[in-house]
Amino acid sequence: MTTNTVSRKVAWLRVVTLAVAAFIFNTTEFVPVGLLSDIAQSFHMQTAQVGIMLTIYAWVVALMSLPFMLMTSQVERRKLLICLFVVFIASHVLSFLSWSFTVLVISRIGVAFAHAIFWSITASLAIRMAPAGKRAQALSLIATGTALAMVLGLPLGRIVGQYFGWRMTFFAIGIGALITLLCLIKLLPLLPSEHSGSLKSLPLLFRRPALMSIYLLTVVVVTAHYTAYSYIEPFVQNIAGFSANFATALLLLLGGAGIIGSVIFGKLGNQYASALVSTAIALLLVCLALLLPAANSEIHLGVLSIFWGIAMMIIGLGMQVKVLALAPDATDVAMALFSGIFNIGIGAGALVGNQVSLHWSMSMIGYVGAVPAFAALIWSIIIFRRWPVTLEEQTQ
C-alpha cells in the first residue's frame, strides 16, 4: 500500500505521527539544557562540567549520522523506524536508572545513535507519505513538531524535572516514545528505501558549491547559537539572578517565538529565503551581543528571547529547505550530512560555552557567541551574492 492508494486522512495521520516523533527526538536532545543545574546537584558536580554531556551527544550524532545512514540504506524504513525507537526507549530507561554521571552519558549516547538515523530519513519519509501536492505542508508539519519541542517539550521537561526530579523527565520521554512507536506500527505501510544515496553520492554532493556553502554556514551559525543557549538556564539563575520559574518561562517564550518564525518563513520563504536567512542571522547576532546587558531586567530578557527564537527557527528552516532542494537525488545522504554538521555546531557551541563558563565567566557566553554569529552573517552575504539565483534552483 502506498500513499497514492490511501485516503488523505490516513496519509496526514502518518505525517502527523512522524511530526510527533520529531517532537520527541528534539525534546530529548534539548531538554538537558533546562536540567543542567538539577543533574549537577544530583551528581555533586559543577553545572559547566555536566554541560559536556551536550557536546558528547551532539558529536556522536555528527560522527554517526552518515555511517549509520549508509549502513541502513537498504533497510525497509518501517522496520528501521521500529528498531531505532526500541533503542531510543531502552536508552531512556537507562537514563532514568542511571546511578552515575558516566552511566547517564552512556544512555545519552544510545539516544544519539537513534537520533543519528532518525533525522537522516525523516524529511524524505514525510515527503513520500504526504497527500498529493502537499509535500511542503508535510515538511512544515515536521518543522512544527521541531518547534513545539522548544515551545512545550523543553519547558515541560524542565517543569517535570523541577517538581519530580530530572530522572522522571527522561522516563516520561520514554513513555511518549513508546506510545508513538505503537502508532507507527499501526499506521505505517512497508516503506522500501528510495533515493537514499550511497557513498557514490558523496563526491557528487561535494561538487555542489552552493550546498557546501550552506553546510559551512550551518555549522558556524549553530555554533554561535549554542555557545549561549546551552547555558541559558544557569545564566538566568546565576548571572541574571532570576528565579528557576523565570528560567522556565524564558525557555517557553524562546521556544514559542519559534512558531512565529515558522509562520514568517512559511509566508515569505519561497520568494525571499536568502534575505530571510541573512536577516535572521543579523538578528541572532544582535541578541547574543545584548544578552548580558539585557540580564538586568526580566522584561528585556523576555523581549530578547522572542527575537532570538524567531531568528533561530527561520535559520533552521532555511537551511533544511535549501539542502533538500539542492540534493533531490540523494536526500537521505544530504540530510544525514546536514544532521551531522548541525550537531557539530551544537557540540562546538556547547563546548565553547563550557570552556568560557569554566575558565572565564558564564556572563561572557553571549559576547563569545556573537563572534561566530558575525562570521556567519558575512558568509551568508557572500554566498547569496555569489549565487544570486535562489539556491533552491541551484542543482549543481
From Swiss-Prot:
Role of this protein: Involved in the efflux of sugars. The physiological role may be the reduction of the intracellular concentration of toxic sugars or sugar metabolites. Transports L-arabinose and to a lesser extent IPTG. Seems to contribute to the control of the arabinose regulon.
Organism: Escherichia coli (strain K12)
Keyword tags: Cell inner membrane, Cell membrane, Membrane, Sugar transport, Transmembrane, Transmembrane helix, Transport
Pfam families: MFS_1
Spans within the Periplasmic topological domain: 36-49, 102, 157-169, 230-245, 296-298, 354-363
KW Glycoprotein (keyword) present: no
Cross-referenced HAMAP family: MFS_SotB
Membrane topology classification: Multi-pass membrane protein
Encoding gene, per UniProt annotation: sotB
Keyword presence, Lyase: no
Protein known as: Sugar efflux transporter
CDD domains, per the entry: MFS_NepI_like
Transmembrane segments annotated in the record for this chain: 15-35, 50-70, 81-101, 103-123, 136-156, 170-190, 209-229, 246-266, 275-295, 299-319, 333-353, 364-384
Any one cellular-component term (Gene Ontology): plasma membrane
GO terms classed as biological process: transmembrane transport
